């Protein structure tokens, strides 16, 4: 559902942010 999609998006952003560090 939308909740799972939102969670996936947040996870992707978090991974990108950590990689940027």
Swiss-Prot record:
Q: Which UniProt keywords apply?
A: Amidation, Amphibian defense peptide, Antimicrobial, Secreted
The primary site where this protein sits is secreted
Give Gene Ontology CC terms. extracellular region
Gene Ontology biological-process annotations? defense response
Q: In which tissues is it expressed?
A: Expressed by the skin glands.
> Subcellular localization, per the record?
Secreted
List residues modified as Leucine amide: 21
Question: In which domain of life is the source organism classified?
Answer: Eukaryota
Coiled-coil residues are none
What is stated as this protein's family in its record?
Answer: Belongs to the gastrin/cholecystokinin family. Magainin subfamily.
Job description of the protein: Antimicrobial peptide.
This protein is called Peptide PGLa-R3
